[in-house]
Amino acid sequence: SILKQELPLGKIIRLKYNRQVHKNEKGSILNFNMKQQTQNNPLGTEAVSGLMVKFAIPSIVAMLVGALYNIVDQLFIGQAVGTLGNAATNIAFPLTTSCLALALLFGIGGASCFNLTMGEGNREKAAYYIGNAVSMLFLCGLALCLITQFFLNSLLKFFGAPQDVLPYAQEYVRITALGFPFLLLTTGGGHLIRADGNPRMTMICNLTGAIINTVLDALFVMVFQMGMAGAALATVIGQVISAVIVICYLYHF
């Protein structure tokens, strides 16, 4: 399978992990909480009842917060642009759904491989799977971004965009497509972080991006009167910030 072929980022994370292990054998202490978390995964040590609460609540919050992106865009666009703008965001939603599907594919797949190898005590191979999953998330997001940019009009018409909505959808999607790699990294990376036993970090990643998106929506759409482009730009910036947090966490395996 794809995850069994070592990709560039997987090799980087694996080599970094080997250096950390070498340092630890000499008696050095890991200073980052992120690193300590990967060394003490609660999934194999804590009671199931406690884990249910620990994982369920942050996961539910993360899913609800993730839905805020579209809701917040709809609210501000409805006020500043009108019903045609709202229709444009709905026309574009199948592309977001495609991103979420790919994120589930590689995020849950990578998390499963990670947990299996961690259960075997093979930390080096676990880091290898994490790196490959992250690489595939980014590459698939980039591919979907390029496909969307090159075939934008055809895709929007296929999704049912009428002529009066098409210009708004084009303006919105051309910008939001730039965030597809980061959306995949955030969503798929969240599954990898949960597999490491830290669902709270996944919640923090999503919450941070949603707050930034809300603030920037108000600024770009209502204050600067940027319309569809402002809402799209706010969404992408929020996704980039969330993805950076995810990568910073995963890089310390």
Protein language model features and the residues they cover:
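Short alpha-helical transmembrane segments in multi-pass integral membrane proteins
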Residues: 3, 11-56, 114-181, 223-253
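Small-residue-rich hydrophobic transmembrane alpha-helices
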Residues: 86-146, 183-202
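Alpha-helical transmembrane segments of multi-pass membrane transporters/permeases
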Residues: 124, 137, 192-218, 229, ...
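Residue-level signal for short hydrophobic patches within transmembrane helices
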Residues: 49-68, 72, 95-102, 178, ...
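Hydrophobic transmembrane alpha-helices of multi-pass small-molecule transporters
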Residues: 98-101, 213-217, 243-247
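Interfacial/gating helices of multi-pass transporter permease domains
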Residues: 77-97, 163-168, 228-231
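Helix-loop interface residues and adjacent transmembrane-helix termini in multi-pass membrane transporters
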Residues: 68-71, 80-83, 117-120, 195-196, ...
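Hydrophobic/aromatic residues in alpha-helical transmembrane segments
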Residues: 73, 110, 151-152, 189, ...
